[in-house]
From Swiss-Prot:
Domain of life per record: Bacteria
Gene Ontology biological-process annotations: DNA recombination; DNA repair; SOS response
Protein name: Protein RecA
Species the sequence originates in: Dichelobacter nodosus (strain VCS1703A)
Family named by the database record: Belongs to the RecA family.
Length: 350
């Protein structure tokens, strides 16, 4: 590339950044993320690294989708807990009317300070969301879920009435209004979404998300969460092995993936992630079944080391800080995902 082309490239990238926001166009080989963007941790160290900026970006729209019982709500409760730990305020728009406060408390959410609403219609839910955003008082707002945002006309109509594209139009209109307010208020708004199957698809994935196409465009980050296995102790199932693919990312290079454990009643196994990443980054050494840190043996077998880190949170925090330094903006990187498993073609029938 000659000098004139370099100048032209710099000029057009600067113009696009001004017009559409920083990080609109990035070189895929460039591992530098938009570090001036504030982030809220997801509660999963591996996912924070995969996202490139240490968490989910404030002032942006984020979508997380996946099959039933894959960990979508669990992950968002972790995000709320992390925001509250840092003195932030959170709201949960429970369109599914299924929030479990006891489970939320187990994940570290301060339910006394959590603002919850259970709207009757999709219009009401999105109006409440817009009002909360415009107040500027909230750090994170979670909408659970897009599929449950039922238009008023559908609720008031008869069973079996056709309402083609009604929810898609509602989402499109709401997101046009929301996106500017979210940026100005520097609020993270997360939409949890479900997966549907398209009938008669011969080639490609038959899966698509609900609510039309608007959210796919307006979201700065889209995450596909899947359960890939079970964690067992004998015959007893203790939790799920989970994989999250970052299928869209406007604040850091996309297509990264994170794998971690979600334990029943506890949420993300933070200690398990620390062990895995610390060994990969050569912060912790593994010799046979023994693990050592700073030339001192800390346990035999992963479970013993996990218990050691739980009993010594200061050591766990020290190792986590070193991992973040090495991976986020450092010389180490997580592997890319194999590809987007969901069809992103226009589908406004939901």
């Amino acid at each position: 590339m000659n000098e004139e082309q370099k100048k032209a490239l710099t000029a057009v990238l600067t113009q696009l950044d001004k017009q559409f926001g920083k990080g609109t166009v990035m070189r895929l080989g460039e591992q530098v993320a938009a570090h001036d963007i504030q982030a809220i941790s997801t509660g999963s160290l591996t996912l924070d690294i995969a996202l490139g900026i240490g968490g989910l970006p404030k002032g942006r729209i984020v979508e997380i989708y996946g099959p039933e019982s894959s960990g979508k709500t669990t992950m968002m409760l972790h995000v709320i807990a992390e925001a509250q730990k840092n003195g932030g305020t959170a709201a949960f728009i429970d369109a599914e009317h299924a929030l479990d406060p006891i489970y939320a408390r187990k994940l570290g959410v301060n339910t006394d300070d959590l603002y919850v609403t259970q709207p009757d219609t999709g219009e009401q839910a999105l109006e409440i969301c817009d009002a909360l955003v415009r107040s500027g008082a909230f750090d994170v707002i979670v909408v659970d879920s897009v599929a449950a945002l039922t238009p008023k006309a559908e609720i008031e109509g008869e069973m079996g009435d056709s309402h083609v594209g009604l929810q898609a139009r509602l989402m499109s209109q709401a997101l046009r209004k929301l996106t500017g307010n979210i940026k100005r208020a520097n609020t993270l708004v997360v939409f949890i979404n479900q997966i549907r199957m398209k009938i008669g698809v011969m080639f490609g994935s038959p899966e698509t998300t609900t609510g039309g196409n608007a959210l796919k465009f307006y979201a700065s980050v889209r995450m596909d969460i899947r359960r890939i296995g079970s964690i067992k102790e004998g015959d007893e199932v203790l939790g799920n092995e989970t994989r999250v693919k970052v299928v869209k990312n406007k604040v850091a290079p996309p297509f990264k993936q994170a794998e971690f454990d979600i334990l029943y009643g506890q949420g993300v196994s933070r200690e398990g992630e620390i062990i895995q990443l610390a060994v990969n980054a050569d912060i912790m050494q593994k010799s046979g079944a023994w693990y050592s840190y700073r030339d001192e043996k800390i346990g035999q077998g992963k479970e013993k080391v996990r218990l050691y880190l739980k009993e010594h949170p200061d050591v766990a925090q020290e190792i986590e800080t070193k991992i973040r330094e090495k991976f986020i903006g450092g010389e180490l990187h997580l592997p890319d995902a194999a590809g987007d498993e969901i069809d992103t073609s226009i589908n406004d029938e939901e």
